[in-house]
A protein has these predicted regions:
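Short glycine/acidic-rich loop motifs that flank beta-strands on beta-rich extracellular proteins
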Residues: 48-54, 70-71, 87-97, 119-126, ...
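Sec-dependent N-terminal signal peptides
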Residues: 3-16
């Protein structure tokens, strides 16, 4: 199945041009800017300190696209060594995601990267109140998706959703520590407020399913939707064969703090996911704890947010 997907993807984009990073352009963003719909941007191993935007239909991949990913893909050298690390001190402080995929109902493919250090991008939620309230909130620590429907496979999402602990005024992703997806007219980018913008509104039909299979999630942080947050999308989101920090091994699933669909519009498909098995009894949280602990009374975890990701229906959380 995995080989078939990669071959199909390559055929789909084979009529376009191929741009190689860093041979053709020194940064991924410059390569994307030069690409046209249907082109492929292939990235060599290295650490790329960038905040990237995709607003066109392209295939973005590491050299993992040429590898056999049928078994043991998590140890693939190209995936582990092709890193997109967000930059938090850019000229636009609202933009803190590793990657933003936006507008036009585009459906690019992102394959074979490690995403790290993303703190999310500021979105404005327009409340339908008697007195309108525009609330800015960071979303999509590693990847923020807005009115787009990408395929995201064979990637690692590690340590996204919160800024460095030594940074003054730490920034935390409100929704989607790893990935956030918005398909909602009541949400807009902070930078788009109060200005007219020329956006390509595609007539493409919205797909019934998002393909987010075969990804690895570790130590991402968010107030809601630790690894994936969806708002407005009414289809299914397939995260099958992915690897999470912790799962309920009895139901082979994670809870709705880890994978969150606001108002339960979307359904998460979780076939054959893996992770550490969680205990459904009681969890203890302490300021002196460690999130690598089991959450027992003798070995408490450190943060309530991490405790939420360990919760089963019959779990009690105790703070000390």
């Amino acid at each position: 199945m995995k080989k078939v997907f990669i071959i199909f993807s390559l055929i789909s984009f084979s009529l376009g041009s191929t741009i190689n990073i860093p041979n053709d352009f020194p940064t991924i963003q410059l390569g994307i800017d030069a690409a046209n719909n249907g082109d492929t941007v292939i990235v060599a191993q290295g650490i790329y300190y960038e905040n990237i935007t995709i607003d066109k239909e392209i295939f973005l991949s590491s050299y993992a696209i040429f590898d056999n990913l049928e078994n043991g893909w998590i140890n693939n050298e190209n995936i582990q060594s092709t890193i997109i690390h967000a930059v938090s001190d850019t000229l636009n402080p609202s933009f803190g995601s590793c990657l933003v995929v936006r507008d036009g109902n585009i459906a690019p493919t992102i394959l074979g990267f490690t995403f790290m250090g993303g703190i999310g991008t500021v979105m404005i939620e327009n409340d339908n109140c008697a007195i309108p309230i525009n609330r800015p909130e960071r979303s999509g620590g590693a990847i923020l998706i807005f009115k787009a429907y990408p395929t995201i496979n064979f990637n690692r999402f590690i340590n996204n959703g919160i800024s460095n602990e030594n940074e003054r005024g730490r920034k935390v992703s409100k929704a989607g520590g790893a990935i956030a997806h918005y398909d909602d007219a009541e949400v807009e980018f902070d930078e788009d407020r109060n200005r007219l913008i020329n956006i390509n509104h595609s007539i493409r039909d919205i797909p019934e399913q998002l393909n987010i299979q075969n990804n690895y999630f570790e130590n991402n942080t968010s107030s809601d939707g630790k690894n994936f947050y969806s708002r407005g999308y009414e289809g299914s989101i397939d995260v099958s064969h992915s690897i999470f920090d912790d799962i309920d091994c009895e139901s082979n699933s994670v809870n709705n703090f880890v994978l969150k669909s606001r108002d339960d519009y979307a359904e998460f498909i979780q076939n054959e996911i893996t992770g550490n098995c969680i205990d459904g009894n009681a969890l203890y949280v302490s300021v002196d704890g460690d999130n690598n602990n089991s959450g027992s009374e003798d070995y408490p975890v450190k943060t309530i947010g991490h405790a939420f990701s360990l919760v089963k229906d019959d779990t009690t959380i105790t703070t000390t």
